[in-house]
From Swiss-Prot:
Native organism: Staphylococcus haemolyticus (strain JCSC1435)
Cross-referenced InterPro entries: Elp3/MiaA/NifB-like_rSAM (IPR006638), Methylthiotransferase (IPR005839), Methylthiotransferase_CS (IPR020612), Methylthiotransferase_N (IPR013848), Methylthiotransferase_N_sf (IPR038135), MiaB_methiolase (IPR006463), rSAM (IPR007197), rSAM_horseshoe (IPR023404)
Gene: miaB
Cofactor field: [4Fe-4S] cluster
Catalytic activity field: N(6)-dimethylallyladenosine(37) in tRNA + (sulfur carrier)-SH + AH2 + 2 S-adenosyl-L-methionine = 2-methylsulfanyl-N(6)-dimethylallyladenosine(37) in tRNA + (sulfur carrier)-H + 5'-deoxyadenosine + L-methionine + A + S-adenosyl-L-homocysteine + 2 H(+)
Binding site for [4Fe-4S] cluster 2: 223, 227, 230
Protein name: tRNA-2-methylthio-N(6)-dimethylallyladenosine synthase
Catalytic EC class: transferase
UniProt keyword annotations, A-Z: 4Fe-4S, Cytoplasm, Iron, Iron-sulfur, Metal-binding, S-adenosyl-L-methionine, Transferase, tRNA processing
Subcellular location: Cytoplasm
Gene3D superfamilies: Methylthiotransferase, N-terminal domain, tm_1862 like domain
């Protein structure tokens, strides 16, 4: 789009906006938006799930983005990354072209994360930084989407303080993006579309996948666990499983397209299938069916220990393309804290599960998540988390200071753990994480492993980088032709969180190493 076209478009858009009447949001949250309510959320399982396989771009929207560009900034989990791929697919279907220059983008979307306060602060900082851009280019559309958009306090804050935002839409509204954009172009007021109905699963949404080697595949949406610290069941809604035939067809398509690795996604993948009324079919069954598809690696995340079944262990133990890496968040090693967290398992039942996994899958790599400084956590309770870590010997862990989320039950709890104590505990835990990570890495010295090469190293573009089946980062010198392929690499040096090696040969079949 040249400068004259841009100016003409700006005048037309602003004229249209001036003719519109400003919206009255006074009843918005009363009629459409439901703020977090544990009591109300627990009733939602009674709703039916509708499967919509007829998604298409309406004729009236075709060409909407012709001559226009878009940029999406993504915060948060793999689910958000996948949502970004879908939004990019819809935008390209509308005729928009992707750009990496935010100053040139005609549509800017901020895909947000609500899991921790720090993530929200980054988003508000980002939106604030865009005020200058909006002043200079009022025709550009700025949208805030993702999990933060499902929070009443966030929407109110944007409505009050960030008039540079043109549209707010939630996690259940992505398929409505063409309508949202159309209204934003014509509306003088901010477009707010945080759809509270969460019972639909929309298939056949277009996607622009990040790369051609690894792919995300959603198998379910939402979460019904209601851990007391977590906002996700409210922002992502109730558990809804995709039909297995739709998932399997998507995976087959990715295999045909040459993808080497897929990750099955869900807020709690272990609950997969429980809501499908006409079928007795769980994650173990899905994994077994996908193991028959010619794709080298299959991962899944995130797992809740409560739903991890012996059937799943049995399928993973068979080997094949289901990788021997299980991410199993424990959050705490103390029963009292686990109960307050609403995790539905005990230290003993978690360790029993770990022992069953290790017995059936001796070469398994276990990783976890841990929260430090939960409301009223004592030193003795924290010590139990450390001792559990010693007992399991996780190969890696994602560790966090507790972050209060408005609307969750934990937000009402009195927090008497001083900040300096929390940080000191986190430091002690991270020291242990580093110790066991280094111990796991040392096993690889002198061994040959199969690496899925993803591209150049972030630190040195003359070095290639990729991951083993157990998700270990490997940096190595090798031919550029290795990118996107499985290669054998001999490990020369082990570090605390990565491995260095030498390229040996191409390997189209996974090499199983213990």
């Amino acid at each position: 789009m040249n400068e004259e076209q841009r100016k003409a478009g700006t005048i037309n858009i602003l004229d249209e906006r001036d003719r519109k009447v400003e919206k009255d949001y006074s009843k918005y949250f009363e009629n459409i938006y439901q703020p977090p309510s544990l009591k109300e959320a627990r009733k939602r399982g009674k709703q039916d799930i509708n499967y919509n396989r007829d998604f298409h771009i309406e004729d009236k929207f075709e060409g909407m983005g012709k001559g226009r560009t878009f940029l999406i900034k993504t915060y948060g989990c793999q689910m958000n990354a996948h949502d970004t791929e879908v939004m990019a697919g819809i935008l390209q279907a509308l005729g928009y072209t992707a750009t990496e220059d935010i100053n040139e983008a005609d549509v800017i979307l901020i895909n947000t994360c609500a899991i921790r306060e720090n993530a929200e602060n980054k988003v508000f900082s980002e939106i604030g930084n865009l005020k200058h851009l909006k002043k200079n280019r009022p025709e550009a559309l700025i949208g805030v989407c993702g999990c933060m958009s499902q929070e009443e306090s966030v929407v109110n804050k944007i409505l009050k303080s960030y008039q540079n935002v043109d549209m707010i839409f939630g996690t259940h509204n992505i398929h409505k993006l063409p309508e949202i954009l159309e209204e934003a172009y014509l509306s003088k007021a901010m477009v707010v579309e945080v759809w509270s109905k969460e019972g639909d699963i929309i298939e056949n949404l277009p996607k622009v996948r990040e790369g051609s080697t690894k792919a995300w595949v959603n198998i379910m949406y939402g979460c019904d666990k209601f851990c007391t610290y977590c906002i996700v069941p409210f922002t992502r809604g109730k558990e809804r499983s995709r039909r297995p035939e739709d998932i399997i067809e998507e995976v087959r398509g990715l295999a045909r397209d040459g993808y080497k690795e897929i990750t099955l996604l869900g807020q709690n993948v272990n609950s997969y299938g429980k809501d499908i009324k006409d079928l007795e079919y769980g994650l173990g069954d899905l994994l077994e069916d996908i193991s028959k598809i010619d794709i080298p690696r299959v991962r899944f995340t995130t797992s809740h220990p409560w739903d991890f079944t012996d059937r799943m262990i049995e399928v993973i133990a068979k080997g094949g393309n289901i990788v021997p890496h299980i991410h199993l968040p424990v959050q705490s090693g103390n029963n009292a804290v686990l109960k307050i967290m609403g995790r539905k398992y005990t230290r003993e039942s978690y360790l029993d599960l770990v022992n069953r996994i290790k017995k059936s899958i001796p070469n398994v790599a276990l990783t976890t998540d841990i929260i430090v400084g939960y409301p009223n956590e004592t030193e003795e309770q924290f010590e139990e988390t450390l001792s559990l870590y010693d007992e399991v010997q996780f190969e890696h862990a994602y560790t966090y200071l507790y972050s209060q989320r408005d609307g969750t039950p934990a937000a009402k709890m009195k927090d008497n753990v001083p900040e300096d104590v929390k940080k000191a505990r986190l430091q002690r835990l991270n020291k242990k994480v580093g110790h066991y990570s280094e111990k796991a890495m040392n096993q690889y010295e002198g061994k040959t492993v199969t690496v899925l090469c993803e591209g150049s190293s972030k630190k040195d573009d003359t070095v290639l980088a990729g991951y083993t089946e157990k998700n270990k980062l490997v940096n190595f010198k090798g031919p550029r032709e290795a990118i996107g392929k499985l290669v054998n690499v001999e490990i020369d040096e082990t570090k605390q969180y990565s491995l260095n090696g030498t390229f040996k040969e191409f390997n189209d079949a996974p090499l199983v190493t213990n």
